[in-house]
Regions:
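Transmembrane-helix motifs of polytopic, lipid-linked glycan transferases
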Residues: 56-58, 70-92, 283-287
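Loop-to-helix entry region of an early transmembrane alpha helix in multi-pass inner-membrane enzymes
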Residues: 43-46, 50, 54, 62-80
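Alpha-helical transmembrane segments and terminal signal-anchor/GPI-anchor hydrophobic tails
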Residues: 148-277
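Short acidic/glycine- and proline-prone juxtamembrane loop motifs at membrane-interface regions
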Residues: 115-122
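Hydrophobic, aromatic-rich transmembrane alpha-helices
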Residues: 82, 253, 257-263, 271-299
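Interfacial juxtamembrane loops and adjacent helix segments
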Residues: 3-52, 56-60
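Membrane-interface helix-loop-helix junctions at transmembrane boundaries of multi-pass membrane enzymes
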Residues: 87, 91, 141-144, 271-272, ...
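Transmembrane-helix signature of polytopic, membrane-embedded enzymes
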Residues: 85-105
Length: 368
């Protein structure tokens, strides 16, 4: 793609913007020579490899092919997203350490967003959208923000469709809940409405039957794990292309996404980081339950938004993904939101006295 800029610039820009390049000429001259333009399998969904290829083609203009320049630029995008997410979280709490912990100190989020991977762009879009959408909701309405928000949503749609599907209903429910006290009812209604919309759309456009698409994706993933004898594969029953099959699989799907890998599934040292991270997150959730505090109405609405996004995303991942390594990677967009939602309730002053009066904890609470 990059070489076309110097040999046939018009072809470069057509491929960069995806306009007028869906023909045999471009397939023969360019696409067939690219390693990842076409995926080894086609599940009928958007090909998220191509946006990363296009971004790196643009970066190469200034990087001259140096890998580390690409890594630095993508890390900068990830930092912009993380910083924007931190600004959003700080609006809802006066505790800086809770924000730092949720955004910057989760190992899997830092690891997967630090390379030349889709997660860096994903975090960039999520963070910027969250911050700018909040400003649109609670500050003066400015139409100039709308095109930018739609652009960020388009990035999510192209980059990770399952994140887009989880994020949009949660965002819309957060927006609607601003005008009512029935926050949970609004979010539940949005989820049910989304499912009904998907079922209706499947009747009109059979190729967009989301239940069949997810069942096929899970089937392909299971077969792939068996064909390559993946070390971190887990047992999973095949989904049937009907709603009842998905409902029955929901509890196990959420358990897989929230808790695995388990200590009994450790097969190498690489299993320990996600295990310890899961234990840490579960520990925070438990502490927030027993040593929690009341939150304001505005905070409560944001917490439910965070939980709705996390649960929908975890459910999609748990239903379709039979490989632990993939589960760990796929769920990182929701981890900062889940962690912050738990920390919003946590009140360190309610801990046992010998812990609450620890000098380090006192310093953290008073200075951060």
């Amino acid at each position: 793609l990059y070489e076309a800029l110097w040999t046939k610039p018009m072809d470069f820009f057509k491929m960069l913007f995806g306009i007028g390049c869906q023909n045999e000429y471009f397939e023969t001259m360019y696409f067939d020579k690219m390693n990842n333009w076409f995926r080894s399998y086609d599940n009928g969904l958007l090909n998220d490899n191509r946006l990363v290829i296009r971004i790196n083609a643009v970066f190469r203009i200034v990087s001259f092919g140096n890998y580390h320049v690409h890594s630095l630029l993508l890390n900068f995008l990830a930092f912009i997203g993380s910083y924007s997410l931190a600004r959003l979280f700080l609006v809802f709490t006066d505790s800086k350490w809770k924000t730092y912990l949720a955004v910057f100190l989760i190992p899997s989020v830092v690891f997967w967003s630090s390379g030349i991977l889709k997660e860096a762009v994903l975090l960039f879009a999520l963070g910027l959208f969250g911050w700018n959408f909040y400003r649109l909701m609670f500050e003066k309405w400015q139409w100039k923000r709308v095109p930018f928000l739609l652009f960020l949503l388009a990035i999510l749609l192209v980059m990770k469709l399952y994140v887009f599907i989880a994020f949009v209903p949660a965002v819309l429910a957060w927006w609607i809940s601003k005008y009512t006290k029935r926050t949970i009812l609004v979010h539940a209604s949005m989820i049910i409405g989304g499912i009904l919309f998907g079922l209706a759309l499947a009747q009109i456009v059979p190729s967009l039957n989301f239940i069949e698409i997810m069942a096929n994706k899970q089937c392909d993933f299971i077969n792939l794990s068996k064909a390559f004898n993946v070390n971190s594969a887990i047992e999973m029953s095949y989904l049937e292309p009907n709603l009842w099959s998905f409902i029955k699989a929901t509890p196990q799907a959420l358990i897989n996404s929230f808790t695995r890998p388990w200590p009994t599934e450790i097969k190498s040292i690489l299993f320990f980081p996600p295990l310890l991270e899961n234990l840490f997150i579960i520990g925070i959730l438990i502490l927030s339950w027993f040593y929690g505090k009341k939150v304001s109405a505005m905070q409560w609405k944001f917490v439910i938004f965070c939980l709705t996004f996390s649960i929908i995303l975890f459910l999609i991942i748990g239903l379709t993904t039979p490989i632990l390594g993939a589960i760990v990677r796929y769920k990182i967009p929701a981890i900062p939101f889940l962690m912050f939602a738990a920390l919003m309730f946590f009140d360190g002053q309610k801990l046992p006295r010998f812990i609450a009066q620890n000098r380090l904890l006192v310093w953290i609470n008073s200075h951060l």
